[in-house]
Amino acid sequence: MFKKTLSMICCVIFLQGCSQEQEVKKELTNMETALLAATEKNETNTVISLLKQGANINATDSQGRTPLMIATYKNDIKTAKALIDAGADVNIQDNIKNNPFLYAGAEGYLDILKLTIDAGADPALTNRYGGTALIPASEHGYITVIKELLTRTNIDVNHVNNLGWTALMEAIVLSNGDETQQQVIRLLIEHGADVNIPDNDGVTPLEHARAHNFEEIEKILVEGRK
């Protein structure tokens, strides 16, 4: 009888423990959901409050986005800073291989880019096209972003993406050849861009520039070959 009673008591204690553990997990899950929702709504103070309560700062939604990734997509500098200051991982990539550093570089979000660099962003990580942050930044002519990447990180200026394009190549092929793009080309060359790296079809940057009638860029490339 005693053994039976003791066994029943142990079972009750075990079940209570399991129930408490489930409640804790449920509470943490609810906080994660609330954290992601608060970030989506740009509610910085709520985000900070939830983090203080123990919400997982690197929780992800169905798209693999962390709170910091969501804040970056929205260019919410205040919330992004709060999350980074609290220790958010800046290198986590979502389901489409974006992370805060890569996306900020691609979209020209200089403030968030600086925050991610300060927090130890890995410049070698690549997006779904196999490109570094420098490649789309060069395509779009984001001069300040390009300078930030070239001077504050060890990003590979000659990295080749899945299309066979370097930052220099993309700055020619996908641009209109205006003064901004000419400045981009000069910057890249000044920081070691190889003007002779061809694309997957064996076409060089100079040949692309000529095909687009980008005379000024052609001159810059010829000078860069010396």
Residue ranges and their predicted role:
Residues Q16-G17:
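C-terminal motif of bacterial Sec signal peptides marking the signal peptidase cleavage site
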Residues A37-N42, I70-D76, Y103-Y109, P136-Y142, ...:
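Ankyrin repeat A-helix N-terminal signature
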Residues E43-L51, D76-I84, Y109-D118, Y142-T151, ...:
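Ankyrin repeat structural motif
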Residues Q22-I70:
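N-terminal segments that cap or nucleate solenoid repeat domains
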Residues V195-K226:
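Leucine-rich solenoid repeat scaffolds
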